């Protein structure tokens, strides 16, 4: 059985430096917590003064809360009708639900008309998201809209980030903020200075596993 051995102090120094260099990050704690487990990642997020965690699926909300996380949690996997666990969290004001299809907005309004949501916009990844030509006309009245989420491909360019922001800003509620992923810290900061809306960045691998020289495997 392999064990992951960590130089804890150097790893924590990396986390602190990363958080300072990219203010406003939203750490991702999905799955098994990048091999560290949810308990440790919750503890480190609290130490860093983080205000929002991201989990992959609705079932993981209970796990981070079990270890003491009592602030906001965003569920990255887009909501779909029929997910009973996700439906049970819709009226929790500290759980932010991701919406990625126009038809799901209508379905969600029937279940939880004041739910806290992020709206995902389709990018060049073409994985999830509301198509660009549908964004401006989305009816989000009544929801607690926390912002718009832009899942860019790995190594995304600043140009695509700018273009996605332009699309979002066509909506009357664009001022709620834009959440990006996979921008470099420099590009993220540059974009946040250019936009007149709040900007956040989700980050997982680069935060938790970015200091690979401080870890090794032992049998």
Residue ranges and their predicted role:
Residues 11-14, 18:
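Alpha-helical packing segments of well-folded alpha/beta enzyme cores
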Residues 152-214:
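Catalytic alpha/beta core domains of metabolic enzymes, predominantly
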């Amino acid at each position: 059985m392999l064990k992951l051995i960590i130089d804890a102090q150097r790893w924590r120094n990396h986390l602190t430096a990363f958080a300072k260099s990219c203010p406003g990050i939203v750490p991702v704690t999905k799955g098994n917590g990048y091999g560290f487990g949810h308990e440790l990642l919750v503890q480190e997020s609290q130490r860093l003064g983080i205000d929002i965690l991201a989990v992959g699926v609705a079932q993981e909300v209970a796990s981070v809360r079990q270890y003491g996380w009592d602030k906001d949690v965003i569920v990255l996997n887009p909501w779909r009708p029929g997910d009973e666990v996700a439906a049970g969290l819709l009226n929790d004001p500290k759980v932010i639900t991701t919406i990625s299809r126009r038809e799901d907005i209508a379905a969600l309004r029937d279940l939880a008309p004041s739910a806290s949501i992020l709206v995902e916009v389709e990018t060049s990844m073409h994985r999830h998201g509301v198509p660009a030509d549908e964004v401006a006309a989305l009816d989000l009245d009544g929801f607690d809209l926390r912002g718009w989420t832009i899942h860019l491909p790995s190594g995304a360019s600043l140009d695509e980030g700018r273009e996605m922001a332009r699309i979002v800003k066509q909506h009357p509620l664009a001022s709620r903020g834009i959440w990006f992923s996979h921008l470099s810290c420099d590009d993220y900061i540059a974009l946040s200075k250019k936009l007149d809306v709040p900007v956040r960045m989700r980050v997982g691998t680069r935060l938790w596993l970015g200091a690979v020289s401080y870890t090794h495997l032992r049998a």
